[in-house]
């Protein structure tokens, strides 16, 4: 800031525009104060804070940006260049604060590094040049290299494009000049001169007005000061060195990098606001779960179905969805009501139709408030939607959260789009030649600067584009084929000539014969690469003829880029290449895409020494040897895993043989897979090597004996009941080994799987014992022994058949009562526990209460029956009391109550998805799961694969007495998102034990199936995998499946199942380390 003496020195005694005063420009030298155009800032009402006079049309910045206007600001600290068109000399000044320090050049500056050029001379607050001269003045944030200085000095068109031409003679003559004005008005026109320093109105720009002492800490340690403050000063600080009080003018220069950076800072400020509004990871997860819950529990409209006046307001869309959901639910109830009224002879539209009236009222609200009326097609589609989730969610809390969230975000997305469009418009207008804003792409430091700058731009630009349309536009802007801006040229050293050279060289490669569909074509392709003379040999690429033809003209820019990447810009280069890759890579198959992607490899080869590619001249021979070894190992695995009809079952050593072959395969793929193109740097090459280290594990399973139905042998209702209970027992015991393994306790009261198995088996025994007791009861009743005690009847009866009937009756009742008490106690305990489970619906819990009461009462009857039997055996109650009529009546009533309970638990049972929703973030019974667990639980439900066993013919009948043989076929159906991905799969088959007796029976060993032999198909847009397993249909099949998560590919869902019957297998979830699988590509084969 100026002191009183400086202010007095610059006091205005002459008015340059007053014809009666002495003209201050009648001096040999005129003072010139350079300032710059900068985008203005705006208040909350959108009004510019420092607009230039609208009537004065001479002020015009470099870029034409909608909704943005220019003001004037001080120059950033940097460099100023003045070419005296009259004297034909170029001068260099360093800009620091409000001081311009002249750099004096000697005669040998051309060979010096840029930072060592010249020596500091006199410092003043303005430029001083003869009043009759014409000047070209230009600003540069980065110091011009000598190449740029020579170019600007010799190239008139570039000089006029980059520098501001100022005719001092013209200004002296008429007092006007484009982009210039009298120095005395400096404070009136320049926004950050004379403004109170505490009002940092430019904080969201690349040059905030913070005091110097604060900003020095903020930028300390940064290599390139992309954001650096410029302290506010008074006009006297600039006017103090004028040759005569008002003998001076200020001239506005262009600073295109500052303009672009200002727009970028404003743009990122809006992005930061949105990020803050979205919140932390927890808040974002709540938002994600809210949207998911809306999708599950409410009717969501497609974008084209939403009324136009509602589309732009997410809160109105939320209200519309809620209204439509309520209307559809009411309309469904009205339809049920209508059928009910019609069945009773009432008119469905009369006073009885209350739900119909409510539905009509809600439809009228939809038409009035939202101008929306559902079509019949929409109603049919929505009726299919499961609305059972509605009662599981805290909708009021969810709606309040969304309304609050949308309110915070309101307008931010539109502002981000607006500021993004402004930034991209300016950046595209910046052009493709760094020379036009004073940057030298042949200089290492300036290459590093441009890489650092564009990497920052790319980070944000590539993150804010999400919809398909904006991504397509961005891909065109960043195209390698036809670049629109410098970000697209970053990979070729910001040189359009280098970009065109790469493209021309690639296009010169003949594509007529190339195909990559089979190994022989790959050999032809490898030969073509070698003949192309691009990647071959041990010579450096720069020595190739094609390089001298195409790249040598742009070799200096590549050399500078290579040095920058090797030194200070390594991280920036990596960031730029990673960010550009999705937009410059060609993901589609075919030769054109392959050739297009070779450009990126070629660029890496030119820039990074460790990325230099070399062609493998022995590729064809190595590929042939690899195929021979691969086929031999696969045959070895096939022989060990796949039995041919008639062969003896494999012994233990065959599993070891398969494991050995698998290890050989892994070693072959990891160490001997031939590479057509390799990196010379071995450390870098290792990142491309993939090793296969799959662990083989046989899934063992205890032998299970199948039982045939005995209903025909037992006959009647009792036989049928026994068969049904036997089937239920087999169903429960099917996967008991795996179910029990989920619980650490062997206490049946603590282990539901074990308890279920015991009481299911017990009920079967009870029914079988009751059948036996019933037959004996008939014989006892015929002999008239029911009124006697069991002891008396046994002692007095002489008939052998009657005595056997009494003994059978006693043993059967003892078995029935004992097992019945145990089974009833276990089932009562389980039902009572489920009754206390708050995650179940009220009616489902009531059903379990009925079951608990019924089984508890049943247990009491068994208890009484058991002790009545004991009493009758010692001379107490009669035989009739052991199986009294009230007991039979009790069992009948209990059966009805139990049946009602079963119906309630099945009809009103919550689905797994309903239970998950009730325990999720917005559920009424939220379990407050961690983020990962909540999403994983959902993936288990939504993307659970389907496994099915079916019987197929293994060997056809050879003659009339030969019925042939069957084998299992496994069918695996996967979610559609897994197409082309790698899953884990392991299939084992446990042969059935021989039915005939063997004195020394060998242990049955599971057989590992080669999953690569299966076939894929697409059915209903889902991948379906089928494989025949060999053996017989009596074998037990075990399957382990590992699927990558949709939201996190590094994690996986794991399932296992086993079965011995045709039909769908029961999949069980497994912990990550519980099962072993082998890799299988979905859809390949």
UniProtKB/Swiss-Prot annotation:
- Enumerate the residue ranges of region (Disordered): 1-20
Q: Which CDD domains match?
A: MIX_IV
Please give, as recorded in its UniProt entry, the membrane topology of this protein. Multi-pass membrane protein
The family database entries (InterPro entries) matched by this protein are listed as: Toxin_VasX, VasX_N
Q: What happens when the gene is disrupted?
A: Deletion of vasX gene together with deletion of vgrG3 fail to kill Escherichia coli.
Keywords for this entry?
Host membrane, Membrane, Secreted, Transmembrane, Transmembrane helix, Virulence
| Subcellular location(s) per record | Secreted; Host membrane
- A GO CC annotation given for this chain: extracellular region
Carries keyword Transmembrane? Answer: yes
- Where does the sequence pass through the membrane? 753-773, 813-833, 860-880, 884-904
Q: Which domain of life is it from?
A: Bacteria
Alphabetical list of NCBIfam families matching this protein: BTH_I2691_fam
Q: Which function does this protein serve?
A: Toxin secreted by the type VI (T6SS) secretion system that acts on prokaryotic target cells. Acts in conjunction with VasW, an accessory protein to VasX, to compromise the inner membrane of prokaryotic target cells.
- Per its record, how is this protein called by name? Toxin VasX
Q: Which organism is it from?
A: Vibrio cholerae serotype O1 (strain ATCC 39315 / El Tor Inaba N16961)
Organismal lineage: Bacteria, Pseudomonadati, Pseudomonadota, Gammaproteobacteria, Vibrionales
